[in-house]
A protein has these predicted regions:
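Short amphipathic alpha-helical segments
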Residues: 14-40
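An amphipathic, aromatic/His-enriched active-site/gating alpha helix that lines ligand/cofactor pockets
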Residues: 30-41, 60-97
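Short, well-ordered beta-strand segments in beta-rich or mixed alpha/beta enzyme
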Residues: 4-9, 42-73
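Generic alpha-helix signal with a bias toward terminal, lower-confidence helices
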Residues: 18-22, 27, 47, 56-58, ...
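A conserved mid-domain beta-alpha-beta active-site/ligand-binding segment of alpha/beta enzyme cores
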Residues: 99-104
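Short, extreme N-terminal segment that most often corresponds to the first beta-strand
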Residues: 1-14, 18-21
Length: 107
């Protein structure tokens, strides 16, 4: 099983909006099902820092990069608008650069 992790900013003043979305996502079985359909187990962490807030996303599965690409391609328009407003992520601009594994204590 492979894993991929990435970090995205929560733009200034948008943390409460993000928290509200997370509350909705937790109640929506279709959201989790979309991740299963993409072949990944997604986890989302909130990282609060003195320099701003971030989310850390992990995708675990046979091919997390392909799963992430599928999630991006099938993102509902309202969620795409949310990602743009809260994270500055334009899902129509193509995928962001994929993260590079810098250290693995078991490798």
């Amino acid at each position: 099983m492979a894993i991929m992790a990435m970090c995205m900013p929560i733009l200034p003043g948008k943390k409460d909006m993000w928290k509200g979305m997370i509350d909705e996502v937790k109640k929506d079985p279709n959201f989790a099902a979309s991740r299963e359909a993409a072949g990944v187990h997604e986890r989302t962490f909130l990282q609060e820092t003195p320099h701003g807030d971030f989310i850390i996303l992990t995708y675990e599965g046979e091919n997390p990069e392909a799963g992430f690409a599928q999630i991006m391609a099938n993102m509902p328009p309202e969620f795409a608008a949310f990602a743009k407003e809260v994270h500055g992520l334009d899902v129509n601009a193509g995928p962001p650069p994929m993260p590079t594994l810098a250290f693995d204590s078991r490798a």
